[in-house]
Amino acid sequence: MKNIIKCDSAPAALGPYSHACEANGFIFTSGQLGIDPATGKLAEGVEAQAHQALVNIDNVLKTAGATMKDILKTTIFLVDLNDFAAVNKVYGDYFGSEFPGRSCFQVSKL
């Protein structure tokens, strides 16, 4: 059975999707941008955006009864691959030394 997760401390969904869904002990989260849920504004700069996106994910997971340590796989979309090191620094602050599997892609027109 599927359980829909709605998180009041993450930005409202911008389309027809849920913050997360849980089934059989697994939680599947939707992607998060670096949008501050209090203001609805995108954080300025790639480090601030990465930080806010990870805060949003953490809040969704907490609502679902999980933590960042429960994450098995992440996917990062960057507009500019030159931001890779800056995002890695912020990412490392949230995961310590127990990193989940990860993919990272450069995308245009994000």
Which positions does each model-derived feature cover?
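Short, polar/acidic, helix-capping and beta-turn segments at strand->helix junctions
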Residues: 1-110
